[in-house]
Amino acid sequence: METTMVTELIPSLPQELGLECMTRLPYTAHRVASQVCKQWCDLLESKDFYYHRKKLGYTHKVACLVQAVHGADVLQGSKQGNSPCFGITVFDSASQTWERLDPVPNYPIELPLFCQLASCEGKLVVMGGWDPVSYEQVSHVFVYDFTTRKWREGKEMPSKRSFFAIGSYSGRVYVVGGHDENKNALRTGWVYDLSKDEWTELTQMNQERDECEGVVIGDEFWVVSGYGTDNQGAFEGDAEVYEFGSGQWRQVKKAWIPGRCPRSCVGVGKDGRLMSWADLDPMVRAGARGITLGSQVMLTGLDNQGSPEEFYLIEMKDAQNGKLEKIIVPDEFSGFVQSGCCVEI
């Protein structure tokens, strides 16, 4: 990484050594360090510095979860009845620590329902969903910076959609499929450039796909299963794959289990084939969610409807054997997990 600093990063140290020290600084100290001086702040918040840390192996993976918040279901009249409120929980598997992020802008009580998460250049991106009071679709984009510990609003999605596939690659977030305000399944897609705060339309898929799931594998974005407007709930067994290099789609047959909802439970096995996290162990067969954290996977789910949500870690090398390690979870973070993603900070 080339630096153009006029003054030394750390007094009395060569610039290269000062950069090495900053690179090794744990992400949990970035917020305090960014307040030392403008030079440190600019460095810690720069995209080049993030990729420099990533190249040298000093980034850190955490799980970000859309999770039901205990005791908040009727807070300030935000909801009627017993419908849960959702917030964003962060779990660090290395330190076994939990925290809940501050609310996103415009929604002081809870997240938009069914919003989607993606990780992009060390930041957490929240898109779409339903207004938690009116249940109308929203097109909001929110970006969380783990250095400043603050949210900002991004440019809104060009069109409102729900239950779409989402994935990120090379500083961009891809949004494809889902359904519009009239519940028509979509085959359109858009890509959001985080640095430019701009949207660009993608070439369309071959068919419409509602409630599809997005997975980035290498240089490809897989949009798994889904169903058409006239086939509600009839989940397809194929997938469409977007090649980042060519910008073209291709269809892959027999990629998924026909009739099974793919939402948040699509994984990639050791052989590179798609798999369902729900098949790993009976303990997570209902509502299974999987988040890959490097060599580990965080699994959430329950053995049957109505039982408490359980949380596990599993080593990827043992994924086919289903050797689950139970996570001890504080009560305030034991709520139902709707979806999630890994953020490499």
Label every model-predicted segment.
Residues 1-345:
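Kelch-like beta-propeller repeat domains
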